[in-house]
């Protein structure tokens, strides 16, 4: 499961979904994750100017903040961001990776030196790119 930006937020939610409880699917339906430059704790969104059009309730914020549900995470996760991204995307990615590690779950934090928010996901298309190489290794299809 992979996602970038808002897609990384959604990927994070998918990664902490209890597949057996929600859909009667095997718990290992998802095998691994890549979350690139996403939002994993939605409280800052509610505190920002976006709150004028993003109307979250406390319950929605709690439910959709994947960083708060890491007890349900059961797959390895790659978290990535670029050094030319906004400070909030960088912070959210670092904090998410740290929280996953603290929860005792397998995580790899990748920092794309010189990549902005729109360039870093392009490295997924290249098997030798930062994200492409990491995902192939996570899948057991290439060495690091």
List where the protein language model places each region.
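Alpha/beta-hydrolase superfamily serine-hydrolase fold, recognizing
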Residues: 1-144
């Amino acid at each position: 499961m992979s996602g970038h930006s808002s897609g990384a937020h959604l990927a994070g939610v998918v990664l902490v979904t209890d597949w057996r409880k929600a859909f009667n699917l095997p718990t290992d339906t998802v095998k691994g994750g890549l979350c690139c430059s996403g939002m994993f704790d939605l409280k800052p969104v509610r505190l920002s100017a976006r709150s004028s059009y993003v109307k979250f309730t406390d319950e929605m914020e709690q439910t959709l903040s994947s960083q708060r549900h890491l007890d349900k995470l059961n797959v390895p996760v790659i978290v990535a961001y670029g050094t030319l991204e906004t400070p909030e995307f960088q912070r959210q990615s670092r904090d998410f990776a740290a929280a996953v590690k603290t929860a005792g779950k397998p995580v790899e934090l990748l920092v794309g030196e010189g990549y902005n928010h729109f360039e870093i996901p392009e490295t997924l298309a290249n098997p030798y790119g930062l994200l492409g190489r990491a995902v192939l290794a996570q899948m057991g299809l290439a060495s690091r």
